[in-house]
């Protein structure tokens, strides 16, 4: 809108400038004041007088000619045909188009502000109504689809031969007719026996496809308990009953296979889940313990550096300071004064501190590992309880649903088989025995899950290995400090021997 305002302002400025140039070109700039009395008695402005009324033969023209004689007549004749007059006309027309566009844009904006919220509400309502409209569409279309589903395989004549597919398009029908006409023209001289053989082959191929598709559809519909959607793919009711009986047997075997596989995999699934959780927890705990061991090594190295500096100052020299009246101790070079005289007790306290720190770390580490083992045992037990709960829910649902299907099989079997047939009675009894046997296996497997010993081998092996590694590290640290202690003892003995010799030398002099 700012750009439109700037453009309109510039156009108005151009219009006024052009208007002024027109007046200056034609010498009418000084006549504006003289024409004011005429404008008072007419409805025209000065500009409109020049635009439309200063023409030959008008009343205004006669008045001006009479007042100003012939001086204005050339201007009156020249002004309407001026080039600037045409430019001004173009400017007026352009300005009118812009004004009309702005008015139209304002109208569109007002309509949008009023209709926009309403359309938005309608769009939201349509979005929430879409699932219901889809359901209505499915309800209306399903009966028609179920009743016409068989028609996609073709229509049949009275003698049972295939004529043509019902849902064939017009283009396919025309192509089929053209092919028939061409075949008739080309095969006029062929024997009728060959034609009969080809027709029989076509019927045989179609029957094979039809039977295979019918079998799969029958089995699917029987398993889904939707017998209304069974596609009749045979010519006899006996074959349909055979398909349904086979589908019931297939469903029975499918139930047995599904439940039996779950029973055999329940224990393995529990152990696998526990092991995967243990691996993740061990990895996190290993990172924590590695960080603690790094801190221990850093502390031990700092103590070793401090201990080495003290051991180095055991071979010190002493000088008497008469000013302070005391003995001062310097390092072996005699240049650096020592803060304190190195004694066995100071070295012993350093070694004692390192032993206490190492012992505290060992206790903390072992306590952390024991807590981790207890925590992992509780975690494994919670996983076991969760798996048992899931298994119980699965067992209840599967056994209850399977028992319902078994009852349905018995009811349907009475219509499909001879209920007094010994083979049918024996098979039905065998099915129920297998059902009860599998049900007992489901219950026994649940009890096995509850009493199953949780495999903590991964955690125990990791803790054992970690303790062994720490023991090796501890032994290395102790060996290092033991070497430093032996070195300090040797230096203390040498220093004591040296001090004894000095004392004897002093006594001999005195």
Curated annotation (Swiss-Prot):
Swiss-Prot/TrEMBL keywords: Phosphoprotein, Signal, Sporulation
Modified residue annotations for Phosphotyrosine: 354
Biased composition (Acidic residues): 169-195
Knockout consequences: A combined deletion of the OSW7 and SHE10 has reduced dityrosine incorporation in the outer spore wall.
Region of interest called Disordered, as start-end residue ranges on this chain: 167-195
Protein's GO biological process: ascospore wall assembly
Cellular component, GO annotation: endoplasmic reticulum
Stretch forming the signal peptide: 1-23
Stated role: Involved in spore wall assembly.
Something else known: Present with 3170 molecules/cell in log phase SD medium.
Protein name, per record: Outer spore wall protein 7
Gene source species: Saccharomyces cerevisiae (strain ATCC 204508 / S288c) (Baker's yeast)
